Amino acid sequence: MGIPDGSLLDLIDKVRSWITSDSSDSLFLLSSSKQDFGIMPIVSKMCHDCGTKVEQGYCCLSCGSCWCKSCSDTEESKMKLCRECDAEVRELRVKSYDKVHPRDSPDPPSSLATESESLASSLEIRDCRNMASIRCYPSRGEEEEARYCGKQLLSPSSDNYQDSSDIESGSVSARHELFSCKSSAGSSPHDSPLRNNFSPLGRFVQHAKDLRSPTVCSFDNHQEQLLADNLVKPGQGVLEQEDHEEEEDKLQQPLDFENNGRIWYPPPPEDENDDAESNYFHYDDEDDDIGDSATEFSLSSSFSSHIPTKEKLGENSNEPLRTVVHDHFRALVAELLRGEELSPSDDGSAGEWLDIVTALAWQAANFVKPDTRAGGSMDPGNYVKIKCVASGNQNESILIRGIVCSKNITHKRMISQYKNPRVMLLAGSLEYQRVAGQLASFNTLLQQENEHMKAIIAKIESLRPNVLLVEKSASSYAQQYLLEKEISLVLNVKRSLLDRIARCTGAVLCPSLDSISTARLGHCELFRTERVLEQHEAGNQSNRKPSRTLMYFEGCPRRLGCTVVLRGSCREELKKVKHVIQYAVFAAYHLSLETSFLADEGASLPKIRLKQPGMVRTASQRRIIDEGISLITQSPTETDSQALLETAAHEDEHTAPMPEHEVCESLCEDFDPTQIFPPSSEVETEQSDTLNGDFANNLVTRSYSSNQLNDLHEPTLCLSSEIPETPTQQPSGEEDNGRGEEENQLVNPQDLPQHESFYEDDVSSEYFSAADSHQSILVSFSSRCVLKESVCERSRLLRIKFYGSFDKPLGRYLKDDLFDKTSSCRSCKELVDAHVLCYSHQNGNLTINVRRLPSMKLPGEQDGKIWMWHRCLRCAHVDGVPPATRRVVMSDAAWGLSFGKFLELSFSNHATANRVASCGHSLQRDCLRFYGFGNMVAFFRYSPINILTVLLPPSMLEFNSHPQQEWIRTEAAELVGKMRTMYTEISDMLNRMEEKSSLLEPEQSEACDLHSRIIGLIDQLVKEKDEYDDALQPIFEENLQIQGSLDILELNRLRRALMIGAHAWDHQLYLLNSQLKKASVFKTGDDNAPRNPEMHDPPKIDRRMQEGSDERDEQSHTDSEANGDNKDPENIPSPGTSLSERIDSAWLGSFQNLEKAETIAETEGFSAVNSSLRRLARPIRVQSFDSAIRFQERIQKGLPPSSLYLSTLRSFHASGEYRNMVRDPVSNVMRTYSQMLPLEVQKLDLIVGSAPTYISSASQMADGARMLIPQRGLNDIVVPVYDDDPASVVSYAINSKEYKEWIVNKGLASSSSSSNLNNRESEPSAFSTWRSLSMDVDYIQHAVYGSSQDDRKSPHLTISFSDRASSSSTATEGKVKFSVTCYFATQFDTLRKTCCPSEVDFVRSLSRCQRWSAQGGKSNVYFAKSLDERFIIKQVVKTELDSFEDFAPEYFKYLKESLSSGSPTCLAKILGIYQVSIKHPKGGKETKMDLMVMENLFYNRRISRIYDLKGSARSRYNPNTSGADKVLLDMNLLETLRTEPIFLGSKAKRSLERAIWNDTNFLASVDVMDYSLLVGFDEERKELVLGIIDFMRQYTWDKHLETWVKASGILGGPKNASPTIVSPKQYKRRFRKAMTTYFLTVPEPWTS
């Protein structure tokens, strides 16, 4: 949105001419920057009404529509708006009247014309250059004066956690060397970083309503008047604003900073006289008189005359400001005196020093006025000098408005005192200069010298000086002649002293004798010398007191220097006081400038009220002026200036309650600045924003020795004053008052007494200065061009020393760096208004935008006037824009404020600098601060930034993650459904059999027993089903996350138990059906009876298996008889015996051993229907695995069974005990398979492998999983194998006994490979037994490194096993053979012991994985992710596997050292590499795949963006950025960084750089390149999750060839970008540099 062209006066005339016109255009001026008013030539336009091409006509001033002359004549003689726009303007005009708030606007206008005339006059910017008005400060009203009476507070100084040598240190102007090229062409930005930014309240700022054409700009003068009328007047209650704060937030409208020109348009001035063109910046010397002595100090005489207010108000109006400033400054001086071991108490001279130093420092700081516009030094220390005189009383110390030096006149007869003297300064020496190379006699030389001196003295006398100061010596002739002429001569004056005298007196130093005639003399009120006798501890040999002569130049006309003369009896004490004054002057000087600046901005003291009574401690050794805490008297004009100054306790044990209605009036003696932070419950703000306290709440200094500082290892709070700290030592002879570095002053919160507490929230967000430097701020600066969308200057650290040689006054920074219309950027050649400048510090970013107003100028450009105003973004918008305060002229003091201090105020959180008197919102946080000069306007906007922390791959992997449990719920739900379906089928079959058995002859004993057995089976079925329901029910409870994590291994065990139970029930039903058929045949005697279609023949029995069973029966019977078979039914037999009989009974399909089966059933503890030996044994309820024993032990001890969930405390131990906390649901599964003999295993395998006869759902129980009966894993872990999931095959293999046994044996055989392996308990196994089941273990010497005795020899393990297909449809296909080769099995096992809580966690995660379409990869290899998202499974190509085998020993060594030492590393840990082979017998198809198991860096994280960074710009851009899990590349990141830089804390940045340095150094040493840094943004936790991946590729010959081809450009590609593939060393350097550039650091308040 633009501003109308042409002169503003012409515009006003047009507005006035329209006032009497038609009402449609009487109020609004709608114009376009590219159009003129009225009739104009129109080229290639079509008439709006008739559609004909017109060459001349009228255009609508709003939408640009045109009419031909004939159409316009038919309507009106003069058309300015079309009908549509005219109607819209009328409607807008009517609405605008209703928008005027009653309390914010004056009385309604009496007529339309009156309002319009007043509008025009208010918008008129008059040219009044002839109205001379010499003013030191702009004028304000009394209500406005009451607002800024608290703006004097010093902000805490910034932290400096790095030495200057560590960063780029330079001036503010140094960074603006970027804008050095001159350019006459102007441009304006078309983009802005704030266009997509959010306001401090998180609202998107966007223009509310545009007119029809976005290119046509309209400015509504009436709306501007409404905006001015709606400005909240100073003095209006803040409480009313608070009550409507929520309503105001809701009323905010979207705002477009770039296209809404009214945002940039300056508001009316606060003082109409400020619009006058005048020579504004002149000092008013009428107020310079500070009195003859500063011996006595009082509020009325000292502070009232030096408070920097806009105009002198009444005493009552200034009282709160003077009180706050006085108390604050006295407290600061008192703390500085304590730092020099001068306790400011009532006793002794130090108490008097407090008043003296406070008075002298304040007066000196307010006297000097550095001429910063002329390039003078900003440092007040260069203008205030301190002389220590060890003579007299300390009360005789005085401030001299001029120069005092230790000099004397050359001759005693020369005049030593002048009033209003004329001072002449001469460089060099006052002697005759003999011409070299010429011969002359002695007499001739004397004569020549005499004549020459006469001539020189004659020239000097012609200027009529009274005092002549010469840098070096003077000849005796010259001295004699000067004595005769009554000119006092001073010799051997240092050049620096001459410069100071010249600066203060106005004299010009003569460089040589030849330029005496053109010299300019200086003036002062009084020149005098004084001889003083000093007192020293050790006198000289003659016991005479040493004397010195002081020379005074008093009453200098220019306020560019003064001298503080300290008197006292002890020189050492005077030196300490001198140090205090040096820092106190600096603080007072900045306090004055900051107060004026905050007053110009409209800031006020925060209004705070006590919530609870405070505690005031008393100390006898400290003087307390006020009794307790008193309330500042509130007057009607002091509403916005009332301040509660908190009182912190003295370090004393005794406390006294403080009345709730009392507040502190004096800060100096009422509080100990080491204890200024009250409990958070004691104070609260009246506003919604957080109270962080004013400057008084930030004043804490405490001196520590260097030894004490070295002991502070914990993060410390730097509770020190923002002003420079007192140096511990300074050379006694040092004339300059340079503020040297001082030892750190840190307060560790742990060192504070227990009764002291901090604002925990406020202290963390409060702005504190660092201990290493209190005189500079460290910021990150960057610049970008919005026109070319390029980064002109990447972010770099910039240290700005306050008021130092590299600092700039705020006014000069604005004029030279922002408002210079000719300077252009060296990088993009564009002007400054096409750029966006950003300064970052702590958690904030200060964005600077500049706009050139094309059609208006602010007055006072020739006089250097800079205007200030602001717009609050949180207040209700007026006509679509935030309300603006009236603009004021930047005062002279604010002009000279340090730009570094300005930045510190902008980033500071202390309450004084964050208040706006008119609305109570934060000035720095919630407002746009505008500065205008001529037709240039700049605004500063603060926006919070997220300081991200860096999360490196953890040393110990986390497995207990609740969000990833949903898939287990789904698995459990499916299992419950199948279980219920199965038991429903069994129940239906038993019910039908029960009906058939009831039809048998009741007199037959067999029929009666059979019926009873069926009834018992039905009861038992119900019990089993209930037990499964109880085991699975907790899965669906709501408090899942409280109980722990679901265990997929337990679900696997239940699934396998159900599958075996289903087949066992199917065989039982078959046997039961056989008995029913036999009974039916016995009843009817008809052998040819038709068979029940539901009844089937038993499967054919392998004769070998049957014979084996018979032999087993015999052996079991013999053993039973030998041991005494007639036992109590409560006794439990051997699990192997009962399991053998149970398998035989299910296998043989007969009742040949029913007595034995029944006995076994009884001894198992299961109740039978009756004791008949003819009864069929019910399904045996056996606890799976060895957990049955533990289950019974828990019951006997009275402990409940453990739940299905994993304990959050990790129930298993390093020994592998997994089942100790997992509940075993009851099922009809046989006892532990580890106790089964091979023959029994084969029988069970045939039972499960056969198709079920009666239970159709049994075949669907496995659901595609190979349950592999029996399981060979330890600790009862069941791992199913899926054909489409190679990771499950790996999980099964590493859980096998063979793998564990091999690892243990290998560790024992080679103890050097891993000493930790001996700590693991080796469990016994029947390895020889399993060998009979075709289990083979191969030891492969896969690679040989050097000799056979080389420690780098790494054997690999191959485990092979097979399984029959799980479903009946594929049972005939034969057994599927699996083979897993574990590369570097021992080394990876050792690594997992270090990184994983237990091997079971690793097995559990790998047991279930799913195919994953990873984004960003180009290799199209197999990718999978474990269902718990803990691991990534990636296929490894042969070249990568070969490379890894080559550097694997170094990899394991590097990780071991990093994990053990805690050294940071970014490497994403590889926890295993395996080769999986699956061979199907049908067709002989074999699948081989090399897999790598790597930790998932983003486990349990909500990642919003993912970047794959290599540090290269070649082919590193992903144009498709939409969709979830899209992997972006380097150029995508650089594109984002232009507007959204990534900021890291200094500690996080150092940790990241150190990790990258370590890892890249290792990878380069093993010749690896082409790795990537995978970065994920977790916005919820504000973390940067990252790790280095793809580090398995060495720089082999094919990569050499790729580098050469890409570098030559044969295959195309960008020529200015280096190839992605380079040598490892080059890759390392490029990678390090890029990662350092990508992630920026922001200076933080705390250092480590």
From Swiss-Prot:
Transmembrane segments: none annotated. GO terms for biological process: phosphatidylinositol metabolic process; stomatal closure. Residues 1316-1639 form the PIPK domain. It catalyses: a 1,2-diacyl-sn-glycero-3-phospho-(1D-myo-inositol-3-phosphate) + ATP = a 1,2-diacyl-sn-glycero-3-phospho-(1D-myo-inositol-3,5-bisphosphate) + ADP + H(+). It comes from the Eukaryota. Its cofactor is Mg(2+); Mn(2+). Keywords: ATP-binding, Kinase, Nucleotide-binding, Transferase. Residues 97-106, 1084-1130 have a biased composition (Basic and acidic residues). Its EC number is 2.7.1.150. GO terms for molecular function: 1-phosphatidylinositol-3-phosphate 5-kinase activity; ATP binding. It is an enzyme of class 2 (transferase). Residues 97-116, 241-276, 721-746, 1083-1139 are annotated as: Disordered. Gene3D superfamilies: 2-Layer Sandwich (3.30.810.10), GroEL (3.50.7.10), Phosphatidylinositol Phosphate Kinase II Beta (3.30.800.10). Pfam families: Cpn60_TCP1 (PF00118), PIP5K (PF01504). Component of the PI(3,5)P2 regulatory complex at least composed of ATG18, SAC/FIG4, FAB1 and VAC14. The PI(3,5)P2 regulatory complex regulates both the synthesis and turnover of phosphatidylinositol 3,5-bisphosphate (PtdIns(3,5)P2). Catalyzes the phosphorylation of phosphatidylinositol 3-phosphate on the fifth hydroxyl of the myo-inositol ring, to form phosphatidylinositol 3,5-bisphosphate. PANTHER family: 1-PHOSPHATIDYLINOSITOL 3-PHOSPHATE 5-KINASE-RELATED (PTHR45748), 1-PHOSPHATIDYLINOSITOL-3-PHOSPHATE 5-KINASE FAB1C-RELATED (PTHR45748:SF14). This is Putative 1-phosphatidylinositol-3-phosphate 5-kinase FAB1C. It comes from Arabidopsis thaliana (Mouse-ear cress). The lineage of its organism: Eukaryota, Viridiplantae, Streptophyta, Embryophyta, Tracheophyta. The gene is FAB1C.
